[in-house]
Design a protein with these regions (language model features):
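Flexible, glycine-rich loop/tail regions that form catalytic "lids" or insertion modules at the edges
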Residues: 1-290
Length: 290
């Protein structure tokens, strides 16, 4: 009762302004003006950013009003394929890779020359290489992204003769061209919800970057289900905000344990509506590339 009878902060402040000669109705007038501004859709506070340029700080307009069924040209010339393949399979003499990793890169070099069929890891690497070479940044984050869940990526080469852990790594995709866009690969902490939430926010602020969160195994997406349900699946219809984040959910590698065989794609199918997301299960290396 005492709390209920006590004047609120607004009343106390309005009374103080009144005692200073600013008028008895100033408090009520400010409330009416504030509510009228909200009803009119006007800004009620000054934006924090001094260079606030439009309704949103990030311009997503080039990506709005498009049809997902429109075909996109994702091919690159054969000469560019070979150039990029050579770049991402060349390891400096100062770096000594593990013998198994060297075999992977030797095979990729053969794939780039056309001497071997392209596998999934090479298809993915070539996709990343063509993007950064064209000026589009790539950001890959997850619990085992450098190596890749199925030991298929090896985006980070560890020098076997290095003396310090933080010195002696080489990332071929960071050495595609002098003026290339950034390629970032992060072995994240083991907190799916925290990492996916961060990457969702990163992607919402940078429409021209391919932002990927990769579950170490697709099953582990259940640790980030709140972010998937509340933001990825429904953020656009709730808040009118689009987001280009990509989730990679490697799964189906039997024999790895009970939590490593299913990405539970049926859950994503249930969340899909009104073109809010694309659910893709590629079956060839070319599909990975394109």
């Amino acid at each position: 009762k005492k709390i209920g009878a006590h004047p609120g902060t607004r009343k106390l402040y309005a009374d103080k302004l009144a005692t200073q000669g600013l008028g008895e109705s100033l408090g009520d007038d400010m409330v009416k003006a504030y509510r009228a501004a909200m009803d009119a859709g006007k800004h009620t506070v000054d934006p924090v950013l001094t260079n606030f340029k439009s309704k949103y700080a990030v311009d997503w307009s080039p990506f709005l009003g498009k049809k997902w069924t429109d075909a996109g040209d994702t091919a690159i010339p054969l000469a560019e394929w070979k150039r990029l393949a050579e770049k991402i399979t060349t390891i400096p003499d100062s770096v000594t890779p593990h013998q198994l990793v060297k075999k992977v890169y030797d095979d990729r070099a053969a794939m780039g020359r056309g001497d071997m069929p392209v596998d999934w890891g090479m298809g993915e690497h070539m996709a990343f290489a063509s993007l950064v070479a064209s000026g589009y940044p790539v950001r890959l984050s997850g619990e085992d992204c450098g190596r890749g869940t199925f030991t298929h990526r090896h985006a980070v080469i560890h020098d076997q003769k290095r003396e310090k852990w933080d010195i002696g790594t080489y990332v071929p995709l960071q050495n595609v061209a002098d003026n290339q866009a950034p390629f970032v690969v992060i072995d994240s902490i083991l907190s799916e919800e925290a990492v996916l939430g961060f990457e969702y926010g990163y992607a919402s602020n940078d429409p021209n970057t391919l932002v990927i969160w990769e579950a170490q195994f697709g099953d582990f997406a259940n640790g980030a289900q709140v972010v998937i349900d509340q933001f990825i699946a429904s953020g656009e219809v709730k808040w009118g905000r689009v987001n280009g984040i990509t989730l990679m959910l490697p799964h189906g590698y039997e024999g790895q344990g009970p939590e490593h065989s299913s990405a539970r794609l049926e859950r994503f199918m249930q969340l899909a509506a009104d073109t809010n997301m694309q659910i893709v299960q590629p079956t060839t290396a070319s599909q990975i590339f394109h």
